[in-house]
Amino acid sequence: MLCAAFAAWIYLGFVLPFRAAAAGRDMLAVRIQGYEASDVLDMLQFLRAHPDAAAIQHGIYAGPALVFPVALAALLFLLMKRARPGGVFFGRAIPAAVIAALFFLPILYGLADCGETLLGALLFPPATPSDQATTMAANILPILVRLKFVVLVVTLILLIRFAALSHRSEQD
């Protein structure tokens, strides 16, 4: 429920006002399809010329975008624990090391999402990074967003799989 409240706060309090201030543009962080380095540089130029949109984006980076990934990572971790990963894969028991790695996935999601937020806060106005830092951030941000969404999708698929398997074994 807390994650849903954060998502609603982000959408209603920041995404919609940003779209209004940016003539229909979306923040990079909410583009599910991802983005490229050129999109980052384009957004940087846009925000430098539009201080209202820059202030809204800075507000999300300074508040809910730092808390939401941590809350969602904790929720995913707890759901993974409740789903009790385990069982067999191709007739062999899943090794303990693999199960431990599965529990690391929600943590990796949280790190990637927080990394994207922190790097965005250091790149976009009111920050004034050097040209070298801008180039580096523009190249790293697309990698972080792809990592974030891939890990999130894999975690959700695994949660569904383990929940279905544990539910089926309880019925047997």
Which sequence ranges carry the predicted segments?
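Hydrophobic core of alpha-helical transmembrane segments in multi-pass integral membrane proteins
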Residues: M1-G13, A73-L76, V153-I160
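Alpha-helical transmembrane segments of multi-pass integral membrane proteins
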Residues: L105-I160
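Interfacial segments of alpha-helical transmembrane regions
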Residues: M1-C3, G91-L108
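Interfacial loop at the N-terminal end of multi-pass membrane proteins
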Residues: M1-I60, T128
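Hydrophobic alpha-helical transmembrane segments
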Residues: G59-K81
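Short, charged juxtamembrane terminal tails flanking transmembrane helices
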Residues: A164-D172
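Alpha-helical transmembrane segments of integral membrane proteins
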Residues: P64-A71, I99, F103, V145-L152
